[in-house]
Each structure stands twice: as structure tokens, then as C-alpha cells.
Amino acid sequence: MAKEKYNRTKPHVNIGTIGHVDHGKTTLTAAISAVLSRKGLAELKDYSNIDNAPEEKERGITIATSHIEYETEKRHYAHVDCPGHADYVKNMITGAAQMDGAILVIASTDGPMAQTREHILLARQVGVPYIVVFLNKTDMVDDPELIELVEEEVKDLLKEYGFPGDEIPIIKGSALKALEEAKAGGDGEWSAKIMELMDAVDSYIPTPKRDTDKDFLMPIEDIFSISGRGTVVTGRVEKGIVKVGDTVELVGIKPTQTTTVTGVEMFRKELDEGEAGDNVGVLLRGTAKEDVERGMVLAKPKSITPHTKFEAEVYILTKEEGGRHTPFFNNYRPQFYVRTTDVTGSIQLPEGTEMVMPGDNVKITVELIHPIALEQGTRFAIREGGHTVGSGVVSKILG
């Protein structure tokens, strides 16, 4: 297929397939690429190519993930699929594959199962904002009433976890039949279902805000004093844009301070502005070097606040991944590595949980010894003696 087809003028969206094991996530991923490849919008990816996902390391955690890309008439998509349940959990918690939306695959022969529930909960906790449902294997269910029952069950389950169950598009079809049809060179009723699914994804999952359109935030990595000019803080702009003349806040560790940007530099050249992804030095007016330390963030005023207490969804590494060899208990006090610094904190386990084993994922409450700029969705590593023993994401700010 001609490479020119991938023209980047279309808006880009990251999605993924989620759902219970053997409900057809990987088959659906293959079917989407097969059906769209017939329209010249994707390269045909075989099921086995997707299922033999390469292992990647994200924050020291090994995750098997397949990434495929395709287009619809309206958009360019990057689609992530994981072969194993544990890979999903790790992927969603570490943010290795950020999802702007997800396709929840449910076999109509089984209805929602344990991992269906777990993936919906994880999507809610880690901030996957939109879900579209594909009811798979409808060719294997003779009674349409049974399919309706499954549909109602799915809506209720989504509502239980705070998703708008009645508004979420539910598309019925068969991934396997669509894949067979497309491979045989046909465009039949099953392929049409895949196109219906992609239309729903196009219209229901909004195009995400670009990083440069978000509020400015830069984690501070280093601080220098330039005689006669003031204090320079360096770091990689995480989101937004910073311009000379902007009023900004220094947030975290110490009481919040307000200051003014008097210069932005990159590679020793002066710039008018720095944007998301740039490694910059920002010159601050009237800020003393001792007022700033690594671990603070430079941010648009009032856009982020310092906190010490939060709930989080975490994955604890196995021994094989270089994690702990033993469980931990209530009041465990590791370091939480947030953006650029380690902060000690204590962990409270949920009621009824006595200990957490390596390889578990669990919801915890954390209290840090000093405040850090945090918001829902902030990711962190849990470290002990410089080694990563876990990975997490803030699901709720408590104080």
C-alpha cells in the first residue's frame, strides 16, 4: 500500500480494545484493520501479528502491547491491544498507552464477565474518558432477546461505574465473520458492522485537546542562578505554552509563589515561547534560587494545586520485574516518584485487605510528608531504595 496515504492532516486519536479474555479483542483489532485495508485506509495486520505482541518496558515494567494504526474518512487512529489481562492492568496504570477512548468488547455468548467489570473500573480510575461497546459473536446467539438482555446488562454495568450507559453506542456484530469476509475480498453485512463501529468511534469519542492547548505545566529539574539576571529553572514542558511576560506559579513542596517569566531559552537561544515537549530554561523575575527546588512545577496560575493526600490505583511489580520479593502491609512507607522527585509517603490499604503481594493491583490511600502539585490522572512510580517497586495513577484528591 502506498505510504502517501498516511497524511497527517487528519486529527489523531489514541484508542484501544478492552474487555474479558477470549471475548474477541484481538480478533476485532484484526477485523478493523482488515475491513479498513479494503478501503485503502489501513495495512492488513494478521491476527497472529497482533497477538504476538512485542514486550516493551515502561517505567521498568514489562508490558506486551500491540500498536496498529489505521484511518477512517475522518481521522487517524493509533490502536493498542494487549494479549494478556495483566498487560492491560499495567498498561492502563502506567499510561504506557494513553487512551482517548476505548472499545469495550463483550461476547454476547457470555455477557459481561469479571474482567469486563475490572476493565470498566480501571478505565474510570485511570481516566479513559469515553467507551464504545462492541457486542461480539452475535452470529452464535440464535435468540435476539438474549442479545437484548446482554445489552441491558452492559448498560447497567457502565452506569454502575459512572459512564453514561444509555448514551454509549453499542454495536452488534462478529469480529471473526468480518475478518473472514474481508480476507475473502468481500464487503458483506459483517464488514458493514465494523464500519458502523468505526463511525460510532468517530462521532462519539471526541478529538482530544492537543497538549499545546492545555494549561501550561513544567516540572522543574534544575535551578541555576545567573548573576545580574536572576534565577533560571529548567525542565521539559509537559503541556501548554510559556511566553515571556507570563505570570506563573511555583507549586509544590513550599508555599505557592507567583513570579513572572522574563526569558525563555532552548539550546542557549532565546525564544519568545516554549511549548509542550520542549526542553527549556525559564528565567524568573525576583525569585531567589533558594526559593525553588527540584520537584516543584512551574504552572499557569490556579491551574494546579499542592496536595499531600490522595487515592490511587497502583500496580505492584513482581519479583521477576525487579520488584519486591515479599508483600507489604498497612502503613508501608516507600517513596513516591512524581515527575522529577521522590517524596516519602505512607500507604493505607482498603478495608479488608491485609497485605499486597507483588503482581497485585490495588486501590490505596497515600499521605505524603510534603505537598506536591497533583491532580486526578497524575502518574507516579513507587520506589524503595532507588528501585521501582510499583506504578500508579492518582484517581482522587483527598487533601
From Swiss-Prot:
The EC class name is hydrolase
Has the keyword Amino-acid biosynthesis been applied to this entry?
no
Q: Where does Mg(2+) bind?
A: T26
- The keyword Ubl conjugation is annotated on this UniProt entry: no
Q: State the CDD domains in the record.
A: EF_Tu, EFTU_II, EFTU_III
Cite the GO molecular-function annotations of the record: GTP binding; GTPase activity; translation elongation factor activity
Instruction: Name one matching Pfam family.
Output: GTP_EFTU_D2
Residue ranges annotated for the tr-type G domain, each copy included: 10-209
Where can this protein be found?
Answer: Cytoplasm
Q: Where is this region: G3?
A: 81-84
Task: Name the family.
Answer: Belongs to the TRAFAC class translation factor GTPase superfamily. Classic translation factor GTPase family. EF-Tu/EF-1A subfamily.
HAMAP family membership? EF_Tu_B
Q: What does this protein do?
A: GTP hydrolase that promotes the GTP-dependent binding of aminoacyl-tRNA to the A-site of ribosomes during protein biosynthesis.
Could you identify this protein by its name?
Elongation factor Tu
